[in-house]
Every structure is written in structure tokens, then in C-alpha cells.
From Swiss-Prot:
HAMAP family: His_ammonia_lyase. This is Histidine ammonia-lyase. The keyword Lyase applies. Contains an active site 4-methylidene-imidazol-5-one (MIO), which is formed autocatalytically by cyclization and dehydration of residues Ala-Ser-Gly. It comes from Acidiphilium cryptum (strain JF-5).
């Protein structure tokens, strides 16, 4: 895949994360070299410019001698490589490098083309720096984690190779790459930027989208298992309100439930007038979820295509101007939006789970077992779902409101985008378990309604689960069933089995 700076779509970044080979468009070289020429001209004029021949942060007024400029950049990288915690997963690191390439290649950072080639070499040879997940406050960019990325270019620290962790210098040597000697401004350009928080937030976005699509599948299966009505999904209702996500979700639910024998069995003469909100209001809730994910996706797509360095080089005028593009507030807000979407999707799913185990609402045997009392059935999986949803509600607290000043109050407002994005991965794990539990229970409900049959799409989704998880008769160990159902959701196998083309998609 070609990385074309400024024009990448979400689908392109998804491909990078999933392991597609990525190479920067060579047409960017002229812009990169023009900006590097501006930096060289500033040094020729002996002009004091932040990040080129000055200190950093609160030390910006300290002038650095020409003989010390290479040491300045190296010291910057080493001193800022202060991250802690678990290493970021390889797919995220791969996306971090690709995002940094796309930003530098816009020709506003002043780095040399050979530095671009060194970064490209990490991707080409799958040399992935070990980047600790903790230590960034999301302004001035993701300094600590990007310093760890840059250390690998210098042959310092560890990288992830085919055989696990190894010395960066050894990995570079095996790939025929020499450790990079940083030129003026290059350390700052590599460290400044929102690429880590953006890569993590994109990962959270992609998982949230996949899981929320799965939530429509499990929600439809639950609706049929609980003998819910499809009348609330009538397109006329949703057209009157006008929200795109709501209309799309209603259309998906109509498609999923069309032709259900279970629905036809109670279409006439059903004494129930209205279903509980967790069934009836799925378009309104999940529509809002998808619209929120869409908004977050558009924000992150813009961020991924932008330049978040400082200062910025404007080659057409020869100016170098300090600003604040490193501030990741947009990413932090997007991460907070994704967190809200994940939390609400799980909250709605848990209420459907609770409905299924309650005979008063579902009309099914208590806890979905034919012999309640002797068997507990699905009693405790509902408790597990409640615990996971409670945790996600706590994690959904906005990260962006928790600014803590840094760098002796020079950097006195920060975004906290990076840990705001990191919590999305845990929240997605929790949601996938909740949906796995709903999948199991809704399928059990369908079995308890036999010989009535569900719709064709939901029937295929039910059948693929039954290939690895049998109907629950007597009580058995539940954890393996949850794990198998979760694997079908995370892999997309459940969605592929349903074969529904009407599920909403991100389009940024």
C-alpha cells in the first residue's frame, strides 16, 4: 500500500494496522528536501530558531553552539525516552511509524530524506521499536513514546523482531541499516507529534466499529429470542427523526429479522403492546453510537493526514513558525467519544441479556435452562456482563478534562489523549465479552423456541456458533463457551455467517 500524505482514508490505516506492506509515495521527496534546505539556510545565517539551535520546553531561550547541534538532538531523544509500562502491540507500533512517515513527508518538518528512508526501513524490515505504553500526556505531542521509537533508529534500546525482543543495533545491522545520526531539528521532529495517541485511538475506533456491528447482530438475535416486535424498526418512524445512524440501524435490524418464523408466530394476537426499551430503542441508541463513531473517525482521519510537529517549516517563504499543532485535544476528544460509544453499546447489550434470563420479560425458562433450580443456566454470565459494563462505565470518564501542567508550567495545558486512547483497548475487550455472552444466551433462547425458526441471516449466525458451542442442557463450565463465542465475534466469523450487507460502516 502506498502512503500518500494528506489523502489517506480510514480504510488505508486499517490495512496498515492489519499488516499490509506500506511504502511512502516517493513523490514527497521534493517537499521534504525543500524544507530541509530551509533548516540548512537558517544555520548558515546563524539565526536563533526554536528546536534547531536552542534548548527545548522551558529551556527554549538557551542558545546552542553549531558544534553541539548533533549532540543536542541525540540528547533530546535519550532524555525523553522515559516511558514505562507494557510495550505497545506490534500492529500499533507499525501504525505509529506509518503515521510519522506521513506527517514528516508533508514537507513541513525540515528533516532530511535519509531520515525518511530510515523510518521506511523500519517498516520494510519489520523492525518495530519497543515502545512503553505509558508516559505521554498528549502535548507536546507523544514525546516519551516517540523518543523510544526514535531510539531504534539510533541503534539504541530494543525492538520487536521475529524471535522476540532484540537489541536495536543488531536488528539494524542484520537489515543492512546503519544507525541514524540526527541532523538539526530532526530529533524534535521525530518526537513532536500525535502519532502514538492517534495510532492507539484508530485501533480503538476499528475495534469499536467491528464490535458495534456485532452488537446489532446479537441484538437482533435477542429480539427474536425474546419474541420482540420488528414494528419499532419501521422506516417511517426513523425518517421522521432524520438521524442517519438511527435510520441505518433500523434498516439493518429489519434486514436481519426479515422472514423470521418466530416473529410471524406472534405477529397477530400478541397481548404485549410495546417491548422494553432495550429491544425497541435499539435504532435510537445504536444509531447514536454509530454516528458518534463516525464523528470520531472523521476527526482521526483528519489528524492522521495532518502535521502535528512544532515548529513548522514553510519552504515557500523560508519561515519557521512555532505553534501548537502537537496538542492532541482533537485526538483526546475523539477517544472520549469512542469510549462513550463502547460503554453505551455494552450497557444496552447487558440490559438485553438481563431480559433474556427473566421469564417475566422473555417468556423463556428462567436463566434459559429447562430445569431451573437443579441447573443455574445462564445466571452468572449475566453477572459477568454486569461487572464488565460497570467497569466500562467507569473507564468512559472523559480523559480530556484531566489536564496536569508539565515542564515547569511552560506546557500548562495538556490533552491526556494517549491514556484516553489506551483505555479503549480494555473497553473493547470488555465489550467483546459482553457481546459473546449475549450471543450465547440469544442462541439458547432460539433453541428453546424450536420448532419455530429465526430468519435466514440469524439462523446462519446461530449455526456457526453451534459448530463450536452446543446447546446448554445440564450445567457445564461456562468460560470456554464465552471464549469460543467471543472468538467468532472478534474474528468476524459471526458477521460473515449472517451475511448482512446492511450493517453500518465508517466512511471517513
Amino acid at each position: 500500500m502506498i502512503i500518500s500524505p494528506g489523502t489517506m482514508r480510514l480504510a488505508d490505516w486499517r490495512a496498515v494496522q492489519e499488516g499490509d506492506a506500506a511504502r511512502l509515495d516517493a513523490g514527497c521527496r521534493a517537499a521534504v528536501e525543500a524544507a530541509a534546505g530551509c533548516v540548512a539556510a537558517i544555520l548558515e545565517r546563524d539565526e536563533a530558531v526554536y528546536g534547531i539551535n536552542t534548548g527545548f520546553g522551558r529551556l527554549a531561550s538557551t542558545r546552542i553552539e553549531p558544534a553541539d547541534l548533533a549532540t543536542l538532538q541525540r540528547n533530546l531523544v535519550l532524555s525523553h525516552a522515559a516511558g514505562v509500562g507494557e510495550a505497545l502491540p506490534a500492529p500499533i507500533v507499525r501504525m505509529v511509524i506509518a503515521l510519522k512517515l506521513a506527517s514528516l513527508a508533508r514537507g513541513a518538518s525540515g528533516v532530511r530524506w535519509e531520515t525518511i528512508e530510515a523510518l521506511q526501513g523500519l517498516l520494510d524490515h519489520d523492525i518495530l521499536p519497543v515502545i512503553p505504553a505509558q508516559g505521554s500526556v498528549g502535548a507536546s505531542g507523544d514525546l516519551a513514546p516517540l523518543a523510544h521509537m526514535t531510539c531504534a533508529l539510533l541503534g539504541i534500546g530494543e525492538v520487536l523482531g521475529a524471535a522476540g525482543r532484540e537489541d536495536a543495533a543488531a536488528a539494524l545491522g542484520r537489515a543492512g541499516m546503519a544507525p541514524l545520526v540526527l541532523g538539526p531539528k530532526e530529533g524534535l521532529a521525530l518526537l513532536n507529534g500525535t502519532q502514538v495517541s492517534t495510532a492507539i485511538a484508530l485501533t480503538g475506533l476499528f475495534r469499536a466499529e467491528r464490535l458495534c456491528r456485532a452488537a446489532l447482530l446479537t441484538g437482533a438475535l435477542t429480539t427474536d429470542a425474546a419474541r420482540g416486535s420488528d414494528a419499532p424498526f419501521d422506516p417511517r418512524i426513523h425518517a421522521l427523526r432524520g438521524h442517519a445512524g438511527q435510520m441505518a440501524v433500523a434498516a439493518a435490524l429489519r434486514t436481519l429479522l426479515a422472514g423470521s418464523g418466530i416473529r410471524d408466530s406472534h405477529r397477530i394476537g400478541d397481548p404485549r403492546v410495546q417491548d422494553p426499551y432495550s429491544l425497541r430503542c435499539q435504532p435510537q441508541v445504536m444509531g447514536a453510537v454509530f454516528d458518534l463513531l463516525g464523528q470520531a473517525g472523521r476527526t482521526l482521519a483528519t489528524e492522521a493526514n495532518g502535521v502535528s510537529d512544532n515548529p513548522l517549516v514553510f519552504a515557500e517563504t523560508g519561515e519557521v513558525i512555532s505553534g501548537g499543532n502537537f496538542h492532541a485535544e482533537y485526538v483526546a476528544f475523539a477517544a472520549d467519544q469512542i469510549a462513550l460509544a463502547i460503554a453505551e453499546a455494552g450497557s444496552l447489550a447487558e440490559r438485553r441479556i438481563a431480559l433474556l434470563v427473566d421469564p417475566a420479560h422473555s417468556g423463556l425458562p428462567a436463566f434459559l435452562t429447562r430445569a431451573p433450580g437443579l441447573n443455574s443456566g445462564y445466571m452468572i454470565p449475566q453477572v459477568t456482563a454486569a461487572a464488565l459494563v460497570a467497569e466500562n462505565r467507569m473507564l468512559a470518564h472523559p480523559a480530556s478534562v484531566d489536564s496536569i501542567p508539565t515542564s515547569a508550567n511552560q506546557e500548562d495545558h495538556v490533552s491526556m489523549a494517549t491514556h484516553g486512547a489506551m483505555r479503549l483497548l480494555r473497553m473493547a475487550d470488555n465489550l467483546s465479552h459482553v457481546l459473546a455472552i449475549e450471543y450465547l444466551m440469544a442462541a439458547q433462547g432460539i433453541d428453546l423456541l424450536a420448532p419455530l425458526a429465526t430468519s435466514a441471516p440469524l439462523g446462519r449466525m446461530h449455526a456457526v456458533l453451534r459448530e463450536s458451542v452446543p446447546v446448554l442442557g445440564e450445567d457445564r463450565l461456562m468460560a470456554p463457551d464465552i471464549a469460543r463465542a467471543r472468538a467468532l465475534i472478534e474474528s468476524g466469523a459471526a458477521e460473515r455467517a449472517a451475511g448482512c450487507d446492511a450493517l453500518p460502516e465508517l466512511d471517513a
